[in-house]
Regions:
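Hydrophobic h-region of N-terminal signal peptides that target proteins for export
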Residues: 12-19
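Bacterial N-terminal signal peptides that target proteins for export
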Residues: 1-7
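Extreme N-terminal starter segment of soluble prokaryotic enzymes
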Residues: 22-25
Length: 276
């Protein structure tokens, strides 16, 4: 990875942004979709605008709300705790979720549903209890619990779970968004990180090229899109002026991802504020 050349205007913007630099500690309680979103490019994107992130990912592949809750209650050591500090990643196997939660005074902790269930409202029945237990364990009294709104599968997906949505990307996308809109207010989660909306908007401009397999994001373009979304959400700074991107993403694609990210942030705010 490298940072692209900066114009005088870009340098002026960076100086201005640097005056408002932030240090933010964020923990994702997730699965492979949080791995796609926070473990690649996010730290570098924030650093490019003068911000510092401590990033944690409580990882179990395919983990659902119910399994996270059960793990928290029983103390199972099923997690890989991936942590990025100063741009360096560590991976601690056989970790407990309660230990991960108290590892740092996290400013933001995100929750998410396993992708097959992400658009199924009945699968959210234990979200309130999970949120309560996480919040009680958190050592930062001002921690904010947020939701990671994930993406629909590519239209060509052969995943068996896709059949629950009629093997339709549009149907799955709408189900994910509508489920978040209906279920999150019930448990007091007010804000979403709209990775799934960014991915869907990017598909409109770039085609259905955001995935590397039947469900996961592509290693460069897709993961970059999710990381841009997290960066703008966490820092509150427009991604449009960010000067970092992976070498294997073209300048045109960067512009489209930036546009999709910025639009997704506005769109999710309207969705969450709309009458239910």
């Amino acid at each position: 990875m490298k940072r692209k050349g900066l114009t005088i205007l870009s340098l002026m913007l960076l100086v201005s942004i640097g005056l408002r630099a932030k240090t933010i500690k964020v923990l994702a309680i997730g699965n492979s979709f949080s791995e796609d979103a926070v473990e690649n490019y996010l730290y570098e994107l924030a650093a490019a605008q003068g911000d510092s992130l401590v990033i944690g990912n409580a990882y179990i592949g395919g983990c659902s709300i119910d399994r996270h809750l059960d793990n928290l209650k029983t103390g199972k050591t099923d997690y890989a705790f991936r942590k990025i500090v100063g741009g360096k990643k560590t991976d601690t196997k056989k970790s407990r979720l309660d230990s991960i939660i108290v590892n740092e005074p996290w400013d933001i902790i995100s929750l998410q549903q396993a992708s097959p269930l992400s658009g199924q409202p009945d699968s959210y029945k234990n979200l309130g209890e999970l949120k309560r237990m996480v919040q009680e364990l958190a050592t930062n009294p001002n921690v904010e619990i947020v939701w990671h709104l994930t993406w629909a599968y590519p239209q060509k997906s052969r995943s068996g779970a896709f059949k629950s949505y009629g093997s339709s990307q549009e149907t799955m996308y709408k189900a994910i968004v509508n489920t978040a809109k209906e279920e999150l207010p019930k448990v007091g989660i007010e804000r979403c990180i709209p990775s799934g909306i960014t991915v869907q908007l990017a598909r409109e401009d770039l085609g259905d090229c955001m995935n590397r397999d039947d469900i996961h994001l592509s290693l460069s373009l897709g993961r970059f899109a999710a990381a841009c979304t997290w960066c703008e959400f966490l820092t509150g700074k427009s991604i449009l002026y960010n000067t970092y991107w992976p070498d294997d993403v073209s300048g045109f694609d960067v512009k489209m991802i930036h546009k999709a990210t910025h639009k997704a942030m506005k769109k999710v705010n309207k969705i969450m504020k709309a009458p239910h």
